[in-house]
Amino acid sequence: MKHDGVVRISLLLIASIITLAALYYSQAIMAPVTFALFTVAIAWPLQSALQKRIPVLLALVVTIVVTLAVLAILIFLVVWGFGLVFQWVINNTDRIQTLYAQATEWLDSHGVSITNLVADSYNPGWIIGAIREVGGRSYGLVSFIVIAFAFIVLGLLEVDIARRNVEQLNSQSLRRSLLRGAEKIADKFQKYMVVRTTMSLLTGVVVWSFALVAGIELATAWGVIAFVLNYIPFIGPFIATVFPTLFVLVQTGSWQVCFAVFVCLNIIQFVIGSYLEPRIAGAALSMSPFVVLLAVFFWSFLWGIAGAFIGLPIMIAILTICEQHKSTEAIALLLSAGERKSA
């Protein structure tokens, strides 16, 4: 018996390692497909409501247009915000040159020659490599968008078909489990996006208010950037903290003010992103804050930025599936924020 248990655990570990390796190396396909499934779950209520009043294909077109419009608005806001910042930087290059001269002089006085470091680090091969890296990432982004869009369209078209196929299964328990599990996953995905959007709006408003009070120029742009980037856990808030900090350094020329702004922005991001949001999301989704953070880090490791965004929805789906079966119900209970109702 003991030997059988060891073999069973060993096989489970081997299967887990193989699965994780497969997910890692299939990122180019699995990440956009997973994102598409998540988007279908979010957009389906609109599609379902529309196709009760208009033809299915027309409802699909409207749903796709609305989904793309939301994504386009978010992208536009980021481009608009950083565009204002970039224009401000161009108009204030003299300040940047002055800061660079001061920093170089200070480093030289402490025995660090920044000029020699830059000269030694310069390598045309590095520039070529950087250009190739940018090109590769751009190709990856385009590929991600194309694959995700294709599966979003197909997914929205086949939701009703998939439901009818499940309803024709002979096993009543399996049929009930699949339908109820899918409904719960979709419902939790929608709750997650409500929480995410609420926290992003709160972050944007607080950052905007802080920038106004602190006298930071382009306060609206920084608030908008913080709002949009907050949809990408940890990576987005990091960017929304570092860029305003460097901007303040150029604006004021004071390292003390720069440090103070950096500390304040980190406090804002920590309180909202690491304290309020995990607890609110955990309460809404019956997940512990620890699991919320672990999901983001784990899937970021596997799939990068895409994993950071969809890591928590994946964990939501896994735990919801575990709820539906007696053999795995204990896993969902152990990782929950509190007491769960029996499925």
Identify the role of each PLM range.
Residues 30, 34, 50, 205, ...:
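Transmembrane helix boundary and interhelical junction motifs in multipass membrane proteins
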Residues 8, 140-251, 255-263:
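Alpha-helical transmembrane segments and their immediate interhelical loop/hinge regions
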Residues 258-343:
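Hydrophobic alpha-helical transmembrane segments of membrane transport and translocation systems
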Residues 46-54, 61-62, 74-148, 159-169:
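Juxtamembrane membrane-interface segments in integral membrane proteins
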Residues 2-19, 78-100, 133-150, 173, ...:
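Hydrophobic alpha-helical transmembrane segments
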Residues 3, 23-27, 47, 51-54, ...:
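Alpha-helical membrane-interface segments at transmembrane helix boundaries
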Residues 36-43, 70, 152-155, 224-231, ...:
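Hydrophobic transmembrane alpha-helices
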Residues 1-80, 152, 316-343:
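Anchoring transmembrane alpha helix of integral membrane proteins
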